[in-house]
């Protein structure tokens, strides 16, 4: 990813996080790398992580060839929904961190919705 492209993504992410902070609800944040996918649920003020899931965890890795495809994103989405609900979080704002709502990001969001999270 070029520097300018990454700076633009971070600028979009900053704007989105500002709007989410004004809503006052928990935030489901996604980080995408070339090899893995990470998801975290933060408190409404962003000071504490309530739940987390990623493709490095053993329960997600089982049965996957790699952690960078949509199948892995679906597993992470279901797992983050399960963990957030166990922590008492039902409603979240989806923070895609400036990434396009497409591919792995969309697969994770759809799986989290199916898991019971409301965006």
From Swiss-Prot:
**Might you report a single GO cellular component term?**
cytosolic large ribosomal subunit
Single annotated GO MF = structural constituent of ribosome
> Does Ribosomal protein count among this protein's keywords?
yes
Q: What are its GO biological-process terms?
A: translation
What are the UniProt keywords, alphabetically? Answer: Ribonucleoprotein, Ribosomal protein, RNA-binding, rRNA-binding
**Any matching Pfam family:** Ribosomal_L18p
Instruction: Family membership, please give it.
Output: Belongs to the universal ribosomal protein uL18 family.
Self-association or partners: how does it assemble? Part of the 50S ribosomal subunit; part of the 5S rRNA/L5/L18/L25 subcomplex. Contacts the 5S and 23S rRNAs.
What biological function has been recorded for the protein in this entry? Answer: This is one of the proteins that bind and probably mediate the attachment of the 5S RNA into the large ribosomal subunit, where it forms part of the central protuberance.
Name listed for the protein in its UniProt record: Large ribosomal subunit protein uL18
**What is the organism field in this record?**
Xanthomonas oryzae pv. oryzae (strain PXO99A)
**Taxonomic lineage from the root:** Bacteria, Pseudomonadati, Pseudomonadota, Gammaproteobacteria, Lysobacterales
Q: Which gene encodes it?
A: rplR
């Amino acid at each position: 990813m070029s520097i300018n492209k990454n700076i633009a993504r971070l600028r979009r992410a900053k704007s989105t996080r500002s709007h989410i902070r004004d809503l006052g609800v928990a935030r489901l944040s996604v980080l995408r790398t070339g090899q893995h996918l990470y998801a975290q649920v933060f408190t409404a003020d962003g000071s504490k992580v309530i739940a987390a899931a990623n493709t490095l965890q053993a329960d997600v890795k089982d049965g996957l060839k790699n952690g960078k495809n949509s199948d892995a994103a679906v597993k992470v989405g279901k797992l983050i929904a399960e963990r957030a609900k166990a922590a008492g979080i039902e409603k979240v704002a989806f923070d895609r961190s400036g990434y396009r709502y497409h591919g792995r990001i969309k697969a994770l969001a759809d799986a989290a919705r199916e898991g019971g999270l409301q965006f």
